[in-house]
């Protein structure tokens, strides 16, 4: 473990929408340091969402992130030779990073032709409480509910 808490790096808002969350999302989508390609994918996904729905792309994005943020998760804890899945609350920074990770993973697993289409469809699904990313959150909640009896092992 580290001696001190890691300093939180300042993140610049993205140039089009001025959102720090979207910048984090762009960085998560990025492969091999190709940020301009990642930006192109995300902004074209936003255009697809805006052309399809009644909401703007950024509104749908923010709603999807809020719907996917987990409030509770399970962590493994060894007690006397047995490993228990202990439900714990999730800190806000981790909520955001989990939501972003789940959205990116779910959109990469979809079957549409381009990544922008996959991302747009996953964001629209997540904003309406559907899709694989939302299913991942529900599974996490189900695990926490099933292991509620071990909540007193929290640390």
UniProtKB/Swiss-Prot annotation:
Keywords carried by this UniProt record: Ribonucleoprotein, Ribosomal protein, RNA-binding, rRNA-binding, tRNA-binding
Pfam families the UniProt entry points to: Ribosomal_S7
GO molecular function per UniProt: rRNA binding; structural constituent of ribosome; tRNA binding
Domain of life of the source: Bacteria
Coiled coil start-end: none
Disulfide feature: none
GO biological process, one term: translation
GO cellular component: small ribosomal subunit
Gene3D superfamilies found in the cross-reference section: Ribosomal protein S7 domain (1.10.455.10)
Database matches in NCBIfam families: rpsG_bact
Family stated for the protein in its record: Belongs to the universal ribosomal protein uS7 family.
General function of this protein: One of the primary rRNA binding proteins, it binds directly to 16S rRNA where it nucleates assembly of the head domain of the 30S subunit. Is located at the subunit interface close to the decoding center, probably blocks exit of the E-site tRNA.
HAMAP family in alphabetical order: Ribosomal_uS7_B
Subunit field text: Part of the 30S ribosomal subunit. Contacts proteins S9 and S11.
The name this protein goes by in its record: Small ribosomal subunit protein uS7
Organism: Sulfurimonas denitrificans (strain ATCC 33889 / DSM 1251)
Protein encoded by which gene: rpsG
């Amino acid at each position: 473990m580290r001696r001190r808490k890691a300093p939180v790096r300042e993140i610049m808002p993205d140039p089009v929408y001025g959102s720090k969350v979207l910048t984090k999302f762009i960085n998560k989508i990025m492969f091999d340091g190709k940020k301009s390609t990642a930006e192109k994918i995300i902004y074209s996904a936003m255009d697809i969402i805006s052309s399809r729905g009644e909401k703007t792309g950024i509104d749908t994005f923010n709603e999807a992130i809020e719907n996917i943020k987990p409030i509770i998760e399970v962590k493994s804890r060894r007690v006397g030779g047995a490993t228990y899945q202990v439900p714990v609350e999730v800190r806000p920074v981790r909520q955001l990073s989990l939501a972003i990770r789940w959205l990116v993973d779910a959109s990469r697993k979809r079957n549409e032709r381009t990544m922008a289409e996959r991302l747009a469809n996953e964001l629209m699904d997540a904003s309406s409480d559907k899709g694989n990313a939302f299913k991942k959150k529900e599974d996490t909640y189900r695990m926490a509910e099933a292991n509620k009896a071990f909540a007193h092992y929290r640390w």
